Design a protein with these regions (language model features):
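Cytoplasmic helix-loop-helix junction between adjacent transmembrane helices
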Residues: 97-131
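Interfacial helix-cap and linker-helix signal at transmembrane-aqueous boundaries
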Residues: 29-30, 61-62, 142-151, 231-232, ...
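Helix-breaking motifs and short loop linkers at transmembrane-helix boundaries and internal kinks
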Residues: 34, 66, 87-92, 236, ...
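Conserved MFS/SLC helix-loop-helix module at the cytosolic interface between two early adjacent transmembrane helices
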Residues: 53-92
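Helix-to-loop junctions at the C-terminal end of transmembrane segments
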Residues: 54-67, 256-269, 353-354
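A late C-terminal transmembrane helix in Major Facilitator Superfamily
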Residues: 321-358
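Helix-loop-helix hairpin linking two adjacent transmembrane segments in secondary transporters
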Residues: 128-179
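Extracytoplasmic gate region of multi-pass secondary transporters
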Residues: 22-23, 204-247, 251-254
Length: 397
């Protein structure tokens, strides 16, 4: 299944490719379309709304059509949405394209994560999310290159749309690999959902685990969005120097996930999560107590490094908590909670920072980490305490 694994990695890079494009093109897009600066927030919320809806419905969709077809159609939808952005004459067209972009992202995210969790070792889950980070990093580079070449944001969107189109063609040409893998490992395609989505919430340990997903993604998004502002406001360095904070943070996430992939063969999911919590807590304390901008940036680097193994390990543990039959459905709900956390908490921090100042940044993150640790540990104890319903599966977290 090595060839298929490469396709999955490329698909996840394609999933990350448009993720940071909106922020990259918005300064020029806003001027060209005469839109309000704040409109980008509503566009982002539209994408997120589509992602949450399709995450919850992903189990039914994938069971009906299979992972391969879902991934192909999602790549096609993403490419068409980006092309729509490039050709849009005004703001209404942007909103029409934002929704299908979100719908495509959510179902693909669930389908690929569940496929890897069921069929591959834990290290591949970490590397999968590393490729998402690579895709998210390449998107703005493509936009910047098109702008430097004298093009516009429309050209940047068109180029990324072409990349998604090429990925779609590649997926169509390799669809037989997916069919063979699903057949050999046992496919859920064509089967009915194992349980109603609402029943997941009644399972012992489910709610603490879902809260852990929301809180983790709240931390990751808040740390990335507000880190540079915190360093700039606290130490008075230039905006160009402060911008390095974001590079260090996201670089740490990417490098950390590569390293976590190698560590996953020797460490359980539980150990990876706890190690990540400890390293990120150390980074938060260093950021809080730092006497210089560079120490604070080093602390934020450690925060990203600590976060790196946590989310992939939490997702990889889902089949061992709920069983292969339920894992895809549960993963959809987990990701819906994750998206809600990453959408709501950065604005919440902004609302608190307005009267209190961005100096609350490390304390805010540490409070979220303590709550996330409590929720995840409680879930682990509750799942470990009851007899597991899966057959032939051992607990790996």
């Amino acid at each position: 299944m090595t060839a298929l694994l490469v396709i999955i990695y490329l698909s996840f890079a394609g999933l990350g490719l448009p993720n940071s494009v909106l922020g990259s093109i918005w300064p020029q897009m806003q001027l060209d379309l005469g839109a309000k600066v704040s409109l980008v927030g509503y566009l982002s919320m539209t994408v997120t709304a589509g992602t949450v809806v399709s995450s919850v419905l992903a189990d039914r969709i994938v069971r009906r059509f299979g992972v391969a077809k879902v991934t192909v159609v999602s790549a096609l939808m993403t490419g068409c949405a980006l092309l729509g952005f490039a050709l849009s004459p005004g703001v209404p067209g942007l909103f029409l394209c934002a929704l299908p972009m979100g719908l495509a992202a959510g179902v693909t995210d669930v389908a690929l994560n569940n496929f890897v969790a069921l069929h591959y070792e834990a290290k591949h889950m970490s590397w999968l999310h590393c490729f998402w980070g690579i895709g998210a990093s390449v998107g703005p580079v493509i936009v910047a290159a098109s702008l430097r070449a004298g093009g516009s944001w429309r050209m940047g969107c068109g180029l990324i749309s072409a990349v998604e189109g090429a990925l779609c063609v590649l997926l169509v040409c390799t669809i037989s690999l997916w069919n063979r893998a699903s057949g050999s490992a046992g496919s859920l395609q064509g089967s009915a959902p194992a349980a109603r989505a609402a029943s997941i919430f009644r399972r012992k340990g489910a709610m603490p685990l879902l809260c852990g997903f929301a809180l983790y993604n709240a931390m990751e998004a808040t740390a990335g969005l507000w880190g540079a502002t915190f360093v700039h406001d606290s130490f008075g360095i230039s905006t160009s120097d402060a911008a390095l904070t974001s590079t260090l943070y996201f670089g740490a996430l990417t490098v950390g996930r590569i390293a976590a992939g190698f560590a996953a063969s020797r460490r359980s999911d539980r150990q990876l999560i706890r190690t990540g919590m400890a390293v990120s807590a150390l980074g938060m304390l260093l950021t809080w107590l730092a006497g210089s901008a560079w120490l604070a940036m080093g602390g934020i680097f450690l925060i990203g490094l600590g976060f790196a193994p946590m989310y992939p390990a939490m997702l990889h543990a889902t089949p061992s908590y709920f069983g292969a039959e339920l894992s895809q459905q549960v993963m959809g709900v987990e990701m819906a909670f994750a998206y809600v956390g990453s959408t709501c908490f950065p604005p919440l921090f902004g609302a608190l920072a307005a009267p209190l100042g961005t100096s609350i940044y490390p304390g805010f993150l540490l409070a979220c980490l303590l709550l996330a640790a409590a929720a995840i540990e409680l879930a682990d104890r509750l799942f470990s305490a009851r007899e597991f319903c899966g057959k032939g599966e051992k607990q790996i977290i």
